[in-house]
Structure formats: C-alpha cells, structure tokens
C-alpha cells in the first residue's frame, strides 16, 4: 500500500536591515528546486520581518497544511556555519521590525513557557549530516537571537507542539553560495524527518509492549 505523502513547510525571511538580499530565502528557493523526494509535499513561504505578520501567518500555515514538520530558515550576520537551533525563547523582544514595531509585552505568548525545545534531537541531526561529508559545516545553538528568528521559532514551536525546527545560515558568500546552502538544507531536513520517524517508531513500540 502506498504511503501517504508528508507535508513539510519551509520558510525563509524577506529583506531587513543590511540584508537587502536575505540568504535564508535564497537558500529556501534553492531547496525548492532540489525538492525533498517523491514522498514529501514541500511548501515554501517567504516571511516578512514583521512581528504581527508572524503572529498571524505561522498558525495559519500549521492550520492549512497540518505538516509533519515546519522548518524556519533565517540569516545570521555572525554565523560562519549552518546552525541548528535547539529552542525558541518567549521573552526579550526589544528590536524593532521592518514596520518599526516590537511587541509591547516583549514576548511571543503571554503566560507561555520561558522556552520551548524542538522535539527533534538536533545533536543527532548534526552528527548525521556531518557524516555525509558535505562541503558545509553544521553546528548547534541554544540562542536564536531574540529577534524575528527566535520569535518565529517560538511561535511555531508553541503552535506545533515542538514539531518545528530553525536553521540559521550565514550571509551569501560568507563562506557558502546559494547552491551549497540549498543542498545543506535538503540534507538537514531529510535527516530531521528520519530522526522524527525513528522517535515516533520508538514511541509506537513502547505503547505496544
């Protein structure tokens, strides 16, 4: 019997500040060209760097697609590797967005937990991707930066009960080009899906014991 296709949503960000071309959206567009194989329905979206749009759009994407996984991709001017973020944070949002706005409460979800961890084992994903021998270095982080990246991640983790991931990429050419970032994203997301399936298989086995 044919397995149902999995829905995977991947987002990148639009321009902001010094990033007139946002490497995250370029990388996501490269991923879209490559695809994630016949068993995955890939849906990609460009997200404006605006808190209020994120608060409206992220829950809508979860509602529309009921995805197996949502992966958000953002650019970090400080990054020199492709970085897997373990968690999103609820408070500390003071930086103004493209609309010169920041939440009055400085938080994502009032009365929400301080932080939410992804249910994906990022250490395992990092190790698996590293063994593939890609020409891109992959590392782990627990601080997505308290700006729109972190805000988006927490919002998605909260709505998706942890079935979300965030990947930070460096600016284009520092040191990776668009093709390298797109291929790295594909490898990372394929490994994330593998780790998720393995974890769910383990849970299913435990329930049957």
UniProtKB/Swiss-Prot annotation:
Q: Give one GO term, molecular function aspect.
A: pyroglutamyl-peptidase activity
A Pfam family assignment: Peptidase_C15
Q: Which Gene3D superfamilies match?
A: Peptidase C15, pyroglutamyl peptidase I-like
**Role of this protein:** Removes 5-oxoproline from various penultimate amino acid residues except L-proline.
Keywords, alphabetical: Cytoplasm, Hydrolase, Protease, Thiol protease
User: Which EC number(s) does UniProt give?
Assistant: 3.4.19.3
Q: List the disulfide bonds.
A: none
Alphabetical GO biological process terms: protein catabolic process; proteolysis
Recorded catalytic activity of this chain's protein = Release of an N-terminal pyroglutamyl group from a polypeptide, the second amino acid generally not being Pro
Report the source organism. Rattus norvegicus (Rat)
Q: What is its main location?
A: cytoplasm
Family, according to the entry, reads as follows: Belongs to the peptidase C15 family.
How it assembles, according to the record, is:
Monomer.
Q: Where is the active site?
A: 85, 149, 168
Could you tell me which PROSITE patterns the record lists for this protein? Answer: PYRASE_CYS, PYRASE_GLU
- A GO cellular component entry from the record: cytosol
Compartment list: Cytoplasm
Name of the protein in its database record: Pyroglutamyl-peptidase 1
Q: Which domain of life is it from?
A: Eukaryota
Q: Which InterPro entries match?
A: Peptidase_C15 (IPR000816), Peptidase_C15-like (IPR016125), Peptidase_C15-like_sf (IPR036440), PGPEP1_Cys_AS (IPR033694), PGPEP1_Glu_AS (IPR033693)
């Amino acid at each position: 019997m044919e397995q149902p296709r999995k829905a995977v949503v991947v987002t990148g960000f639009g321009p902001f500040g010094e990033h007139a071309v946002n490497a995250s959206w370029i990388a996501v567009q490269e991923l879209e060209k490559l695809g994630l194989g016949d068993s995955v329905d890939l849906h990609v979206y460009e997200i404006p760097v605006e808190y209020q749009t994120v608060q409206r759009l992220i829950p809508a994407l979860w509602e529309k697609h009921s995805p197996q996984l949502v992966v958000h991709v953002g650019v970090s001017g400080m990054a020199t590797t492709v970085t897997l973020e373990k968690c999103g944070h609820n408070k500390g949002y003071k930086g103004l967005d493209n609309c010169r706005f920041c939440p009055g409460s400085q938080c994502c979800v009032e009365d929400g937990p301080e932080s939410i961890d992804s249910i994906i084992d990022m250490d395992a994903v990092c190790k698996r991707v590293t063994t593939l021998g890609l020409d891109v270095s992959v590392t782990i982080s627990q601080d997505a930066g308290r700006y729109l990246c972190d805000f988006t991640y927490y919002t998605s983790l909260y709505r998706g009960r942890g079935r979300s991931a965030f990947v930070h990429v460096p600016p284009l050419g520092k040191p990776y080009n668009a093709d390298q970032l797109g291929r790295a994203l594909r490898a990372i997301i394929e490994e994330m899906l593998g780790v998720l399936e393995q974890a769910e298989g383990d849970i299913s086995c435990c329930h049957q014991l």
